[in-house]
UniProtKB/Swiss-Prot annotation:
The keyword Ion transport applies. GO terms for cellular component: plasma membrane. HAMAP family: NRAMP. The chain crosses the membrane at residues 27-47, 51-71, 100-120, 128-148, 160-180, 201-221, 248-268, 289-309, 337-357, 358-378, 396-416. Belongs to the NRAMP family. The keyword Endoplasmic reticulum does not apply. Keywords: Cell membrane, Ion transport, Membrane, Symport, Transmembrane, Transmembrane helix, Transport. It comes from Caldanaerobacter subterraneus subsp. tengcongensis (strain DSM 15242 / JCM 11007 / NBRC 100824 / MB4). H(+)-stimulated, divalent metal cation uptake system. Signal peptide: none annotated. Pfam families: Nramp (PF01566). GO terms for molecular function: cadmium ion transmembrane transporter activity; manganese ion transmembrane transporter activity; metal ion binding; symporter activity. This is Divalent metal cation transporter MntH. One of its GO terms (biological process) is iron ion transmembrane transport.
Amino acid sequence: METREIASQRRKNLYLGIELKKFLKYLGPAFIVSVAYVDPGNFATNISGGSLFDYHLIWVILWSNVIAIFLQIQSAKLGIATGYNLPEMCSIIFPRKWNWFLWITAELAAMATDLAEFLGGTMGLYLLFHIPMTYAAFLTGVVTFAIVYMEKYGQKVVEGIIFGLVAVISLAYAFELFIARPDWSKVLYHTFIPSIPNKDAMLIAVGILGATVMPHVIYLHSQLVQYRNKDGSLQAKKEHLKMEKIDILVAMNTAFIINAAMLIVSAAVFYKNGIVIESIEEAHKTLEPLLGVFSSWAFGIALLASGFSSSAVGTMAGQTIMKGFVGLNIPLNVRRLVTMVPAITIIALGIDPLKSLIVSQVVLSFELPMAIIPLLLITSNKKFMKEFADTPLERIMGVLVASFVMILNGLLLYLTLKGEV
């Protein structure tokens, strides 16, 4: 009897080993994508949200993450099912005028993204090593290009670098959470019970949505899965999608925990002490007297890792957008130089990086429908998706997601035009 149990256990262990090996083969694309969900724009909105409104907006991060998981699965599914990325499918399906409109809006989103990510890396270098902002900006550009250049040696190499940087961000904020000692009963309550304290919170809520659900990686994810999309059989595609869903769940929930930690630490440290944070530099300086020098260093390291990794991912997404929509394939170093200009201009003019980051995230939230609607139109089209076309439930979820984003953006626009935010 014992022998049978041992044999059964061995078979289970062997099966689990095979499944784990299979999963590790597919692990990666979602972690590249997840970097965009913990970029410096998230630092800006989450720090502001926590210092101004305590734990009230954690639920926004939760539901933004649920939306992000759904959209990234849809993007990956499109890439696996069709063999094309989302911009390429748009250029195939939509009339030329619409395609150019989608391309321009996608490029604007990429510029807003690059601004946030580039500023994050620059601020990280400035805060940690006191490198002047202008020099730090150029150094950020060099590091970003070096990361993207490693793609020459295979996508797995870039995935490994990005995974390492995400691990650094995770460890830094795990340390921050440990020493901040938040009120976990409040954290739990506000994670599941929605509340918007006032009209000013609406701007931060939409900023959190824009920072957490990123349009450029909706385009990018459909490209990243192509690397492993070598067997065109139906069975292979189904297996690929199954593994990619697990990849997405692991990566995106890691991003959710990091985002929630940012807001929780801000609420537990800044709001609790009646401190309203108005700049990233102020957040860094204020942490030291409240939680110690190691806390401010952890914050700076997390910001630096976030800026470097997300800036590299932004460059990759920009290439996918330009090549897919209009067939242009400019060198990466030229692309990096072009996207450096807005960030360096803001630095040179002395504009507050925190406010620039928040505005960039709001811009991204308005771009979201331009990425979401084409994605959902294509994934529900049986002609292109065949067996992978959306089920009725997925279509309903798609309509709900698109409606939620547009209603939230419409409300913000209305309040902005009235001058109430």
